[in-house]
Amino acid sequence: MHKKFFTIGIIVIVIGCIGIIAGAAFVGQGFAKQMYLVESMKQENIKLGDLGVTGEDADKVIDNAKYAQMVADKVREDRHQIAPSYEALLGGKHFDPTDPKQLSYAQALNLENYLYLAVASFGIVDIALGTGAFMIITGIALILIGILLFKFARKIPEESS
């Protein structure tokens, strides 16, 4: 048995196991955060129709990136009808929470930020899930390579000095 290939095989298998464990952690965190996002959005119970979306999807609760993006874009469009920018809204003055126009603009801005943050969060979840899956597959491949190195080490005699 060739000790050098045997040792390399062990190292490769250990790295593969670490990859699988890390990948499983990524996947676990990804699914946990995805469930958290979906449940949090369902608790808010904001429906597409509440924000001006018409059609067959109007009664659906915003609970995914597609709906959040669609509605955030709609809120942004509606907000720009109030004023093209925050600076234009204030007209060189300070924010006045008693002004209904400024208050509506601020509420739209908050809702828009909430929805775009949800879109970004779902994207990060997808990245975590994809990265975790890749790490698991890579870990499995490394373990298989380590096993092949073991078999190879058995067939090669130890070099004599």
What are these regions (language model features)?
Residues 1-14, 123-161:
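Juxtamembrane interface at the cytosolic side of transmembrane helices
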Residues 10-24:
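Hydrophobic membrane-insertion alpha-helices, especially the h-region
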Residues 27-47:
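Alpha-helical transmembrane signal-anchor/signal-peptide segments
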Residues 21-32, 144-151:
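Structural signature of transmembrane alpha-helix termini at the membrane-water interface
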Residues 42-113:
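Long, solvent-exposed extracytoplasmic domains/loops
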Residues 100-136:
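Short, aromatic-rich amphipathic segments at membrane interfaces
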